[in-house]
């Protein structure tokens, strides 16, 4: 049920629109590159995102409607590639795809490697395109590969995805190191030296604690929300939120209804483990997809709405403070999204909801992108001091 709208709703809508246009709206996580690989053979001739794409949550017309000023495009490859020795090679293909996308649509996108790049590109009316890597399995235990990824534009890396790796435990798999191994700590320090943000979105609570203890620069959660609101292991507990505040980090809220709606979180709490079992029971890819789809149809996730999402922002602000929250939607990487946030055109609705809840223009700008820019600047400063 929609909550009652305040008096002067049209005036508030106009004010929200003005605030949104003035902000640098930065999203921490978009999986469009993997969708282009999966659905279009990595070809923008086959999937021209300058045109509306009904199979996607992301295309250029809707990015413009959403007022995006900066986007982290994600280098994702399945965790299983770590077992076949193909993770790094496939990740490099995804880097190439992102660079080809930015070059092809150069009137819209421009690569950004620093916080100042983001500000400049936004001022020029383009969407600053940054790169995040989803999962430390992609470096195949090589610090040289990590540095190579940085040189290719990566400005954050998630320490794990859904599976535990040799040096870091995942939130959704069995523990192996009890957090970070000694080499895992070396990875974090090397990321600090390079100026690459440490992303804790998929890691276990123990890994979070270890990384926050070791890191000399702010960490981020590129697409995670508040555990106190929706109890899912992909979300962040209050004790960690307090540590993030001390660290200067940013929790960028995920929009996926299965992570932010309390009932949705209960349904998806064991989603990664369940999918691994389904794959074991159905080794044929088509059979697996059929079984997966049947389960989803039998267990629909409640959508929630913009307010459901902003409840997470409210909680993170309450526990960690206004300087430690941002947006990391996970478009084209997740399923059910809240009403009015079905695709990348919906960001202005968040600004309106924040304004209606009493957030100031200054604080809204922090949430929409200012906090992430500040964390990136601090990571750059730490790198500069260490000779990175």
Predicted segments, located by residue:
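Short, contiguous, pocket-lining structural segments
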Residues: 176-183, 199-207, 236
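Alpha-helix-loop-beta-strand connector modules within alpha/beta enzyme cores
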Residues: 177-193, 211-221, 350
């Amino acid at each position: 049920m929609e909550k009652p709208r305040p008096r002067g709703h049209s005036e508030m809508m106009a004010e929200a629109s003005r605030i949104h246009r003035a902000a640098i709206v930065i999203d921490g996580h978009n999986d469009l590159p993997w969708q282009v690989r999966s659905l279009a053979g990595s070809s923008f001739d086959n999937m021209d995102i300058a045109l509306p794409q009904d199979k996607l949550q992301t295309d250029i017309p809707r990015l413009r409607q959403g007022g995006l000023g900066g986007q982290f495009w994600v280098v994702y490859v399945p965790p299983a590639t770590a077992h076949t020795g193909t993770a790094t090679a496939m990740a490099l293909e995804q880097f190439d795809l992102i660079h080809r996308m930015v070059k092809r649509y150069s009137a819209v996108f421009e690569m950004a490697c620093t916080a100042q790049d983001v500000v400049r590109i936004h001022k020029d009316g383009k969407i600053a395109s940054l790169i995040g890597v989803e999962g430390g399995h992609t470096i195949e235990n090589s610090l040289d590969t990590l540095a190579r990824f940085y040189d290719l534009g990566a400005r954050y890396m998630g320490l794990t995805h859904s599976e535990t790796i040799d040096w870091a435990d995942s939130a959704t798999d069995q523990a192996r190191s009890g957090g970070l191994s000694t080499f895992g700590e070396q990875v974090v320090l090397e990321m600090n030296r390079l100026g690459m943000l440490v992303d804790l979105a998929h890691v276990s609570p123990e890994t979070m604690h270890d990384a926050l203890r070791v890191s000399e620069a702010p960490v981020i959660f590129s697409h995670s929300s508040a555990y106190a609101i929706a109890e899912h292991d992909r979300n962040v507990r209050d004790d960690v939120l307090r540590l993030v505040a001390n660290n200067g980090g940013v929790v960028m809220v995920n929009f996926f209804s299965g992570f932010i709606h309390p009932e949705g979180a209960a349904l998806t709490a064991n989603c990664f483990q369940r999918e691994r079992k389904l794959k074991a029971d159905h080794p044929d890819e088509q059979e697996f997809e059929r079984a997966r789809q049947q389960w989803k149809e039998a267990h629909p996730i409640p959508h929630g709405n913009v307010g459901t999402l902003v409840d997470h922002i409210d909680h993170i602000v309450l526990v960690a403070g206004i300087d430690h929250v941002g947006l990391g939607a996970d478009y084209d990487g997740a399923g059910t999204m809240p009403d009015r946030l079905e695709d990348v055109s919906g960001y202005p609705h968040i600004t309106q909801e924040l304004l209606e809840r009493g957030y100031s223009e200054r604080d809204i700008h922090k949430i929409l992108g200012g906090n992430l820019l500040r964390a990136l600047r601090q990571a750059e400063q730490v790198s500069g001091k260490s000779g990175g």
